[in-house]
Structure formats: C-alpha cells, structure tokens
Design a protein with these regions (language model features):
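Accessory "access/gating" subregions that flank catalytic or transport cores
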Residues: 4-89, 136-141
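Catalytic phosphate/nucleotide-handling subdomain of diverse soluble enzymes
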Residues: 1, 63, 67-140
Length: 141
C-alpha cells in the first residue's frame, strides 16, 4: 500500500497531521495512473467528508484504509483513534491494524498507553524484531 507507506514516512519525518492528510501531500509523487481509482479517492480525502455509517471497516482495502484515515483525522491520541477505528465494526482487526501502523508512526511508542503496552504478549520478541528491522532499514540506506 504505497499511499500508507508514504504517509508513514511523513510521520517519521515529523510532518503535521494536517499536512499528512492534505490532498497536496506529495502530490507530485503520484502519476495520473499510479493509484487505483478507489485509493486515489482516499488520497484526495474521501474520509474527510464521510461519517459512519458511510465509513466502514470492511476487509476491502480501500474501505479499510479510508476508515483508518478517518479515525486518524478525527482523533487526538493513539488510544482515541484506535477505539474509533475498531468500534466501526465489521473487519475491525484489519482497520485497527492499518490505524495502528499509521498512528504508531505518528505518536511513537510513548503515545501508546502504558497499560496497553504492558499487556502485550511476546513483547520482548517484538521489540527485538522491531530493532532488527530498524537497523536493517538503515543498513540499506
């Protein structure tokens, strides 16, 4: 999902949420035919004008991405947005995973509630893997 990846990169770069979600964010990057019509509509901000029940957390990638971006735009914390995303129902785990990737990049580990982080199964293994992925990314630069 190149659109989500580029928004993630903007998060890591410290971009403001308003800028990340603007239809002008990296607008020069996209060629006329580089995104499917549905993803292009999401890139242009379809999530900004819709509300539930128009926003749905289905397993269809366009709808899931739209729902995750809707929750990201309409929340002020990792916790609030996560609850908004998963409470849309339907394929809540997919929407929550997409939201979590984006919001995790934006808010960082410290933005995830401590009581959630403490409950993670396999936390040491995930931290080790995350560190390895981070180092591998820098090694390829």
């Amino acid at each position: 999902m190149p659109l989500l990846r580029l928004i993630d990169c903007g998060c890591y770069d410290g971009q403001d949420k308003v800028d990340l979600l603007a239809d002008t964010f990296l607008a020069d990057y996209w060629r006329q035919d580089s995104l499917s019509a549905g993803i292009e509509q999401v890139r242009l901000g379809s999530f900004k004008t819709k509300r539930p029940p128009e926003i749905v957390g289905s397993g269809y990638v366009v709808k899931s991405l739209e729902a995750a971006l809707w929750a990201f735009e309409h929340s002020d914390s990792f916790e609030e947005g996560t609850l908004m995303a998963v409470n849309l129902g339907d394929d809540a785990d997919t929407t929550g995973a997409i939201y979590g990737q984006l919001a995790g990049a934006y808010y960082g580990e410290s933005g995830i509630p401590a009581h959630w982080r403490q409950q993670l199964a396999f936390k040491p293994q995930m931290e080790t893997l995350a560190d390895q992925l981070y180092q591998a990314g820098w090694a390829n630069q």
